[in-house]
Curated annotation (Swiss-Prot):
SUPFAM superfamilies linked: Acyl-CoA N-acyltransferases (Nat) (SSF55729)
Top class in the EC scheme: transferase
Origin organism lineage: Bacteria, Pseudomonadati, Pseudomonadota, Gammaproteobacteria, Cellvibrionales
Recorded GO CC terms: cytoplasm
Record EC number: 2.3.2.29
Superkingdom: Bacteria
Function: Functions in the N-end rule pathway of protein degradation where it conjugates Leu from its aminoacyl-tRNA to the N-termini of proteins containing an N-terminal aspartate or glutamate.
Subcellular location: Cytoplasm
Name of the featured protein: Aspartate/glutamate leucyltransferase
Native species: Teredinibacter turnerae (strain ATCC 39867 / T7901)
Main location group: cytoplasm
One GO MF term: arginyl-tRNA--protein transferase activity
Keywords recorded for this protein, A-Z: Acyltransferase, Cytoplasm, Transferase
Length: 243
């Protein structure tokens, strides 16, 4: 019996959906006492699971299948015209990789981002305990990409997990005053290039929901696949747009 088959799953009670109004959601969690390692989490990611801190979950709503796992085919990705403009605009940034963001500089940026951009969400107000519990994991797969300008000002932080067959974009937060740089987009483009350089075929972007406009950006990175009926399927972009 594989490690995956031995895992216990627990379902939450129905609760208000974070993405669709007037909808209730149910979430399945992996047993929090289970031993998770890089290999097992990579396998779980291939089945559409994500993490919040060290808690591994997947939507499991009885009457709704709107949350569709999506991953970009990094090895065949080519930036489009607007993405090339974004790369050019941010060519002055210096990116460094770290194994921790347990410092005041990074937390201050996170706090500003949450308080100014997501004051209507369940992560507001930001605090250090929630910051650590949400972004970090215990499995040694997480890296933090810090984006700085020529004055060494910290403009953005991207949290990324290294899987066996790709990278997983966990979260990105950035300076709200640098909105014109499109730093969220730039962070994804940077991670796609990192995946390609590391010969990893995919960049996992979490869930895509057609009716949720804040998730529209995930289909801007092509080609991509979606997990449909437990199979990763290459998506015809024109069919997604027309539906």
């Amino acid at each position: 019996m594989t490690k995956l088959a031995q895992l216990k799953l627990y379902a939450t009670r129905p609760h208000p959906c974070s993405y669709l109004d007037d909808q209730e959601a149910t979430t399945v969690f992996i047993d929090p006492n289970a031993t998770i390692d890089a290999s097992l989490y990579s396998e779980l990611s291939a089945y559409g699971f994500r993490r919040s801190g060290s808690h591994v979950y997947r939507p499991h709503c009885e009457q709704c299948q709107a949350c569709i796992p999506i991953r970009v085919c990094a090895d065949s990705f080519t930036p489009n015209r607007s993405q090339k403009r974004c790369l050019k605009l941010n060519a002055d940034l210096v990116v460094s990789e770290h194994d921790s963001i347990d410092n005041e500089e990074c937390f201050s940026l996170y706090e500003r981002y949450i308080n100014e951009r997501h004051s209507d969400g369940d992560m507001y107000p930001a605090d250090k305990t929630q910051y650590r519990d949400f972004l970090t994991s215990e499995w040694g797969i997480t890296r933090f990409l810090l984006f700085r300008d020529a004055q060494q000002s910290l403009l953005a932080v991207a949290v990324v997990d290294r899987l066996e067959n790709g990278l997983s974009a966990v979260y990105t937060f950035f300076d709200p005053d640098a909105e014109k740089r499109s730093l969220g987009r730039f962070a994804i483009l940077y991670q796609l290039e990192q995946a390609k350089q590391q010969q990893l075929p995919y960049l996992y972007l979490g869930y895509w929901i057609r009716a949720c406009t804040k998730m529209n950006y995930k289909t801007d990175y092509q080609p991509y696949q979606m997990l449909i009926n437990q199979n990763w399927v290459n998506i015809d972009v024109s069919s997604v747009i027309k539906r």
